[in-house]
Every structure is written in structure tokens, then in C-alpha cells.
């Protein structure tokens, strides 16, 4: 069952019913609670652009509980976060892995957070290839470039040497919230709003 909860709010004109995500959007909160695919990316990008149009000065809050997903979909979100004027605060609630972790560490500096029992995981991009040898070679080169670019981004955002990042992302590298803070992925571990 995938029922979306509704909340009822009292207004001057009576009661108003919202699905919970629309109500959170009123408070400038966007939630990524699934694998990152094109549909999720389109929804998050639309919400980011809408909130910027509503008020370009107020921060936006991106709550992340995601195993990652498509790099192209993830970059659509990340590039939009960088494009818009408002700062995007990020918060890991549960799990931020792969591109979920990249979105987490791409929040505004000083505004990247994790809840105490969160887990963060970074690794190299995954991919596969089939076809003729030339096609496989093209795909391999693309994945290696993507790996380098992602490692460079992690190093820049965390302050870690690229050599350490390259070593750590050779495999799934899991961190607790406190370890992610020490690594530079988040700025603080929060227990209260």
C-alpha cells in the first residue's frame, strides 16, 4: 500500500486539505525518499525552481533518504541546486548513498546535516556495457571520466585530498553520521531543530 497521508489545516476561509508533501513544500521542504531516477529528478527540479520563484532569499531544505540512482538524473538535481539563488540546506535522514551522498555534500557550506543514526555511503559510479568492442570502450571511457569528475567534486566539497577520495570510492565506503562529519560530507550532526 502506497497511500500518501493528508493533513487538514484551519484557515480564515475554513479547512484546507493537503497531501503531506504539498504541506511540507509550503515550509520549503523537499524530500527525496527513494531511488533517484528521471521522474524523481523532474519533480525535485520543479520544486526547487518553484521555491526560488516564490522567494529567492529564503533557504530551501532538501531531506534525503536515498540509495542513489541514475547519475544523469542526480546531476539534473545537483546542477539546479547550484543554479538557483537560495541556499539549499541538506539533511540526511536514514541513508544517503551514491548520488544521494553527492546531493547531501552539495548543500550550502555550513548547512549540510545528518541525523545521528544516519548512514552515508560513497563509491565509484556503476555501469555496464554490451555490444561491439568499440561501444564497450566508449562506455568504459565515459564511466572512468565520470569517476574522476565525481571524485574531484567530493574532494572539493569535503576538503579531502583527491587521492584519499579515489582510494575510498574504489569500493562502497560506509560512514556513520559522525564519520561523515569528520570526512567533511556534512557540517554537523543534529538532534534538534
Swiss-Prot record:
GO terms under biological process: protein quality control for misfolded or incompletely synthesized proteins
Enzyme Commission number(s) from the entry: 3.4.21.92
SUPFAM superfamilies documented for this protein: ClpP/crotonase (SSF52096)
Matching Pfam families: CLP_protease
InterPro entries named in the record: ClpP, ClpP/crotonase-like_dom_sf, ClpP/TepA, ClpP_His_AS
Active site (record annotation): 98 (nucleophile), 123
A single MF term (Gene Ontology): ATP-dependent peptidase activity
Keyword Hydrolase: yes
Keywords in alphabetical order: Cytoplasm, Hydrolase, Protease, Serine protease
CDD domains in the record: S14_ClpP_2
Location in the cell: Cytoplasm
GO cellular component: cytoplasm; endopeptidase Clp complex
Catalytic activity: Hydrolysis of proteins to small peptides in the presence of ATP and magnesium. alpha-casein is the usual test substrate. In the absence of ATP, only oligopeptides shorter than five residues are hydrolyzed (such as succinyl-Leu-Tyr-|-NHMec, and Leu-Tyr-Leu-|-Tyr-Trp, in which cleavage of the -Tyr-|-Leu- and -Tyr-|-Trp bonds also occurs)
Role played: Cleaves peptides in various proteins in a process that requires ATP hydrolysis. Has a chymotrypsin-like activity. Plays a major role in the degradation of misfolded proteins.
Similarity comment: Belongs to the peptidase S14 family.
Record note on quaternary structure: Fourteen ClpP subunits assemble into 2 heptameric rings which stack back to back to give a disk-like structure with a central cavity, resembling the structure of eukaryotic proteasomes.
Protein name as it appears in the record: ATP-dependent Clp protease proteolytic subunit 1
Organism: Bacillus cereus (strain ZK / E33L)
